[in-house]
C-alpha cells in the first residue's frame, strides 16, 4: 500500500538529519572501521580510503559517491508473477514479510503455551502458511533447517523452491561456496534476495560476512545491509549517539557495495534498539524507545532516498497476549509512518527473535489488515491518533474490552515514542562522536554502560504497565487449521 503524506511522521527535521549524516561521515573519516579482510581493505583503498593501523577510514566524498550511485529502484520478482513488486526509493509504498532466525516454535499446550525446537518441517509449514496469508508480500526465512550446517543453504533453497510463490528472501548465506548451487536450485535469481550483517558494532567488519557480501553484490542480487546495535552495550545509550554509529556502519556498507559494483542493489536496514540495563542487558526490540529509534533510522534512510528495509513487530513477549498485540501494532504504525518500505520480521515473531508461532502469524495477518485500514481511511488523523485507534481496534478484534487504564497506557507509550529526550545539535553530536571513538579503542560495552547512567535517570527506557487481558483466538485458530488443513 501507499502511505499518504498526511499519514507520515517526521520526528526529526531535515536539519537534524543532516547533522546526523555529517556526524556519521566524520566518524567514518576520523575513526573508520576495523578491517582485517585484506581484499576488502585493498578495494576500498584503491578508491580513496585510507589505512590507519587496522582501521580503514572513509572520506566524505566516497560516501557521497556511493549514495549517488547506489540503485534507487529494486525489483522483487516472484515465481508467481502476480506477487512481484518494485521498490522505488522515492515512493511511500510499504510491503510486509516474516523473518528472523527463530530457534523455537511456540504452540498451544495444556490450556496455555509450550515451546519446542524449530526444524525443517516448521520451515515448510511456515512457508506454506505465509504463502496463503493476505498481508504477506514476501517471505524471509523464519527458521533454519535442522540439518548439518554444510547442508543448510541447499536444503533451504529446495524448500523455498517447493513451497514459496512470493518473492523469496533467503536471509543469510551459510557457506559462500554454495551460492551458485542455491541460485540454480531456486531456478531464477530474480526471485531471491539476501540479508547481510556486515558490521559488528561498534565499527568492526565481519570477515565472513564480507566474503558473502562480495559474492552477492558481484552477482547483482538485492542485499539488505542489516545493523542492530544495542544502545548501552554495543552502542551509546544515547539515541543521538546510537543513530550516529548506526548510520556510519550502514554507510560503510553502501560505500563497499558500490566499490564492488557501482549501482549495487542495496537496502538500508537499521535496527537501533536499547539494552535492558535494569536486568540482563537483553535487547528491547518492541519497547517505545526502541520503536522510536528504529523509526528514526527509517526516516534517516528515506531522507537520502535509499531503499529502506524496515523492521517491526518483533515482540519482546514470549507467547501470544494482549501485550504482544499492543507492541506489534505500535511498532508497525510508526515504522510505516516513518517511511519504511520493505518491512521484515513483521509477522510471527515472539520473545525478541528467539521464537515464532503459527498462531501468531495468523493473528499478525489479521492485525496488519486492521492497521492498513486505518492508514487507508480518509481524514487527517495524526500518527499518535492513528496508532491509538489501531491499537484499540486490534485489541477489540481479539475480545479485549479496552478500558480507560489500557487507553492511558497506550497513550503513554505513544508519547514516549514521539517525544525527543535529547538535543540534536553540533555540540551534543561531538560528545557522542568522542564517546564512540573512546569505545572502539577500549572495551566498548564497559564504556557505553558507564555512560548510560544519565539516560537511565532521565527515563530513556520506558517503564510502564503490561496490557494484560485474555484473548479470544478462536477465529485465528480456525483460520490456521483451515489453511494448513487444505494443503496437508
Q: Across the structure, where does each feature detected by a protein language model lie?
A:
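A glycine-rich phosphate-binding loop feature that marks nucleotide/adenosyl-phosphate handling sites
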Residues: 40-46, 270-276, 312-320, 350-354, ...
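Catalytic-core signal marking the mid-to-C-terminal active-site face
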Residues: 3, 8-23, 31, 35-43, ...
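Metal-ion/cofactor- or nucleotide/acyl-coenzyme-handling active-site neighborhoods
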Residues: 319-333, 337-339, 350-379
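Short acidic (Asp/Glu) and glycine-rich catalytic loops that position anionic groups and cofactors
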Residues: 1-4, 45-48, 52, 230, ...
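Helix-rich catalytic cores of soluble enzyme domains
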Residues: 114-337, 341
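Glycine-rich, N-terminal phosphate-binding loop and its surrounding beta-alpha-beta segment
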Residues: 42-110
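Generic secondary-structure signature for well-ordered alpha-helical cores
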Residues: 25-33, 45-50, 68, 72-75, ...
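Short beta-alpha connecting loops at secondary-structure transitions
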Residues: 5-9, 279-285, 313-320, 348-360
Amino acid at each position: 500500500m501507499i502511505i499518504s503524506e498526511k499519514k507520515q511522521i517526521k520526528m526529526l527535521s531535515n536539519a537534524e538529519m543532516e547533522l546526523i549524516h555529517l556526524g556519521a561521515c566524520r566518524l567514518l573519516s576520523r575513526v573508520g572501521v576495523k578491517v582485517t579482510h585484506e581484499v576488502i581493505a585493498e578495494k576500498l583503498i584503491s578508491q580513496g580510503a585510507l589505512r590507519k593501523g587496522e582501521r580503514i577510514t572513509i572520506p566524505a566524498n566516497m560516501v557521497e559517491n556511493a549514495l549517488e550511485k547506489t540503485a534507487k529502484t529494486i525489483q522483487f520478482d516472484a515465481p508467481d508473477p502476480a506477487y512481484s513488486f518494485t521498490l522505488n526509493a522515492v515512493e511511500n509504498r510499504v510491503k510486509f514479510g516474516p523473518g528472523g532466525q527463530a530457534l523455537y516454535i511456540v504452540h498451544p499446550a495444556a490450556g496455555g503455551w509450550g515451546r519446542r525446537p524449530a526444524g525443517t518441517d516448521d520451515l515448510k509449514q511456515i512457508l506454506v502458511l505465509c504463502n496463503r496469508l493476505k498481508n504477506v508480500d514476501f517471505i524471509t526465512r523464519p527458521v533454519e533447517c535442522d540439518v548439518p550446517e554444510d547442508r543448510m543453504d541447499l536444503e533451504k533453497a529446495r524448500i523455498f523452491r517447493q513451497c514459496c510463490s512470493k518473492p523469496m528472501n533467503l536471509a543469510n548465506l551459510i557457506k559462500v561456496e554454495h551460492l551458485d548451487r542455491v541460485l540454480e536450485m531456486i531456478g531464477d535469481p530474480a526471485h531471491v534476495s539476501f540479508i547481510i550483517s556486515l558490521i559488528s558494532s561498534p565499527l568492526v567488519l565481519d570477515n565472513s560476512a564480507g566474503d558473502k557480501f562480495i559474492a552477492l553484490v558481484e552477482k547483482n542480487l538485492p542485499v539488505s545491509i542489516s545493523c542492530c546495535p544495542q544502545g548501552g552495550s554495543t552502542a551509546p545509550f544515547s539515541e543521538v549517539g546510537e543513530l550516529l554509529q548506526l548510520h556510519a556502519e550502514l554507510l560503510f556498507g553502501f560505500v563497499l557495495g558500490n566499490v564492488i559494483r557501482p549501482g549495487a542493489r542495496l537496502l538500508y536496514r537499521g535496527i537501533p534498539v536499547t539494552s535492558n540495563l535494569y536486568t540482563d542487558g537483553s535487547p528491547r526490540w518492541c519497547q517505545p524507545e526502541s520503536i522510536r529509534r528504529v523509526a528514526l533510522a527509517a526516516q534517516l534512510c528515506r531522507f537520502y532516498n535509499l531503499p529502506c528495509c524496515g523492521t517491526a513487530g518483533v515482540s519482546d513477549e514470549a507467547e501470544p497476549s494482549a501485550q504482544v498485540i499492543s507492541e506489534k501494532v505500535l511498532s508497525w504504525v510508526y515504522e510505516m509512518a516513518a517511511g519504511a518500505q520493505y518491512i521484515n520480521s513483521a509477522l510471527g515473531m515472539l520473545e525478541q527473535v528467539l521464537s515464532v508461532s503459527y498462531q501468531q502469524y495468523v493473528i499478525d495477518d489479521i492485525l496488519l489488515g486492521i492497521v492498513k485500514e486505518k492508514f487507508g481511511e480518509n481524514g487527517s488523523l495524526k500518527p499518535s491518533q492513528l496508532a491509538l485507534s489501531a491499537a484499540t481496534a486490534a485489541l477489540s478484534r481479539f475480545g479485549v474490552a479496552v478500558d480507560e487504564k489500557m487507553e492511558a497506557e497506550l497513550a503513554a507509550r505513544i508519547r514516549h515514542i514521539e517525544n525527543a529526550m535529547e538535543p540534536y545539535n553540533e555540540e551534543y553530536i561531538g560528545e557522542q562522536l568522542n564517546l564512540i571513538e573512546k569505545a572502539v579503542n577500549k572495551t566498548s560495552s564497559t564504556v557505553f554502560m558507564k555512560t548510560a547512567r544519565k539516560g537511565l535517570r532521565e527515563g530513556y527506557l520506558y517503564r510502564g504497565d503490561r496490557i494484560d487481558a485474555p484473548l479470544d483466538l478462536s477465529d485465528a485458530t480456525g483460520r490456521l487449521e483451515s489453511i494448513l488443513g487444505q494443503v496437508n
